[in-house]
Amino acid sequence: MLSSFTVAALDLIFPALCPVCEATLGTGRRDPLCGACWDSITRLGPPWCDVCGAAPVLAAMLRERARSSAPPPPCAACASDPPAHDYARSAAIYEGELRDALHALKFSGRRALASPLGDLATEQCAASLPGGIDALVPVPLARERERERGFNQSTLLARRIGRRLAVPIRPGWLARVRSTQPQSDLSAAERRANVRGAFRASDRVADRHVLLVDDILTTGATLDACARALRAAGARRIGVLTVARVVHAAV
């Protein structure tokens, strides 16, 4: 085991750099992101639609929520086209330094980022999650993509979140049963078609409250396909938790 003197000397010779902006991190800093990048993240919080997690909700919804003790109504998008899941939460907006950090995790193998990003999701969203969650289920990657990358970022995030929430992680409860194109270059309609029927859930989800975990919510097509597979296998309640979400102009 290295002595504290040796560790300090190595920090001086080979200083750790922030994976986003390449600023030198302070000696002994455990967080792999620098303070400036961490502080620049635009965090999300209530008021939000309880179904899709979009924030902010409309003023009319806030007024109705204040007047009534009944469960709040969904946003207009969820009312007209309800998703397959029951509720969704995202910690922050997918932009700037958070986008770069997620890219560094996924595409540059910076696995250490899974811990602070998982903490971000937990700290920002845990208080608004319903109780009684039986398991966290990470969104599975295609087998060849996971083999090529060496890991599934959603599993890394789920492990950290599960540790913080004291909820078990069950990656075997959901499988990707066919390969799909990368979603990034597809339209919303193409994304839905691309992942339709791509997932199958274990019958172990029957009558369970499961929380899907992923890194980013973009159009929701992948998460909706996962939720449909879980619902078909008998899941009683399905939630979604992501580190980031794309905020569309229509939200």
Located regions from the model:
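Glycine-rich phosphate/pyrophosphate-handling loop used in enzymes and phosphotransfer proteins
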Residues: M1-D214, T218-V251
